[in-house]
Each structure stands twice: as C-alpha cells, then as structure tokens.
C-alpha cells in the first residue's frame, strides 16, 4: 500500500510559513518522501498501517490549508506515468584541481 499526501498550505505570512515548514518536517519524520512539490508518498505494509499514518498526519494539519490523503496499491503505484517537460541542463563539472597559469 502507498499513502500519497497532497497539500496546499498558505505561505503568505511568517506564521503560515512556519506552519508549512512544521507540517513538511512532520511528513518527513513519519517516513514520507517528496514526489514533487506539495506531493509526498510513503509505503505501508498494509491498509491498517496506512490508516495509522493518515490519522497521525491528519492530526497535525495546520488550521489554514488543505491536505488530501490517497491510499493506493503497489500495483496502482507502479502504473504511475511521469511526464517531464523541459529537462534541466546538467551543470558544468568543475575541474578537480586548481590550474595556475
């Protein structure tokens, strides 16, 4: 089972940014990893285990904002299609030694 957390939290005030950062930190501490901005996923051994994590994270949702949790099977997760628009250009590699002229 996979739990996917999708959230939209305000960041317009310092207090809201702090709440956003705290929620994101709680997600990471609970074993979630970032799939893309504001979308995090976590693998769970069973539906019961997934429900425990959803309840735990649901209890720390900031007062302002919205969070949705989606529970899907391993098979469904494996069928996720990812499309990437413009690929990032690789950074030029720095020389391993300084060259003096």
Curated annotation (Swiss-Prot):
<keyword id="KW-0255">Endonuclease</keyword>
<protein>
    <recommendedName>
        <fullName>CRISPR-associated endoribonuclease Cas2</fullName>
        <ecNumber>3.1.-.-</ecNumber>
    </recommendedName>
</protein>
<comment type="function">
    <text>CRISPR (clustered regularly interspaced short palindromic repeat), is an adaptive immune system that provides protection against mobile genetic elements (viruses, transposable elements and conjugative plasmids). CRISPR clusters contain sequences complementary to antecedent mobile elements and target invading nucleic acids. CRISPR clusters are transcribed and processed into CRISPR RNA (crRNA). Functions as a ssRNA-specific endoribonuclease. Involved in the integration of spacer DNA into the CRISPR cassette.</text>
</comment>
<dbReference type="InterPro" id="IPR021127">
    <property type="entry name" value="CRISPR_associated_Cas2"/>
</dbReference>
<dbReference type="InterPro" id="IPR019199">
    <property type="entry name" value="Virulence_VapD/CRISPR_Cas2"/>
</dbReference>
<dbReference type="Pfam" id="PF09827">
    <property type="entry name" value="CRISPR_Cas2"/>
</dbReference>
<comment type="subunit">
    <text>Homodimer, forms a heterotetramer with a Cas1 homodimer.</text>
</comment>
<keyword id="KW-0460">Magnesium</keyword>
<dbReference type="GO" id="GO:0046872">
    <property type="term" value="F:metal ion binding"/>
</dbReference>
<dbReference type="GO" id="GO:0043571">
    <property type="term" value="P:maintenance of CRISPR repeat elements"/>
</dbReference>
<comment type="similarity">
    <text>Belongs to the CRISPR-associated endoribonuclease Cas2 protein family.</text>
</comment>
<keyword id="KW-0051">Antiviral defense</keyword>
<dbReference type="GO" id="GO:0051607">
    <property type="term" value="P:defense response to virus"/>
</dbReference>
<feature type="binding site">
    <location>
        <position position="8"/>
    </location>
    <ligand>
        <name>Mg(2+)</name>
    </ligand>
</feature>
<keyword id="KW-0540">Nuclease</keyword>
<keyword id="KW-0378">Hydrolase</keyword>
<keyword id="KW-0479">Metal-binding</keyword>
<dbReference type="GO" id="GO:0004521">
    <property type="term" value="F:RNA endonuclease activity"/>
</dbReference>
């Amino acid at each position: 089972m996979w739990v996917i957390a999708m959230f939209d939290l305000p960041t317009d005030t310092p207090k809201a940014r702090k709440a956003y950062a705290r929620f994101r930190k709680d997600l990471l501490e609970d074993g979630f990893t970032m799939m893309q901005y504001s979308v995090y996923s976590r693998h769970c051994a069973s539906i019961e285990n997934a429900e425990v994590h959803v309840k735990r994270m649901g209890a720390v949702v900031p007062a302002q904002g919205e969070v949705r949790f989606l529970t899907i099977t391993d098979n469904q997760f494996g069928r996720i299609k990812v499309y990437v628009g413009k690929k990032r250009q690789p950074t030029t590699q720095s020389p391993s030694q300084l060259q003096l002229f």
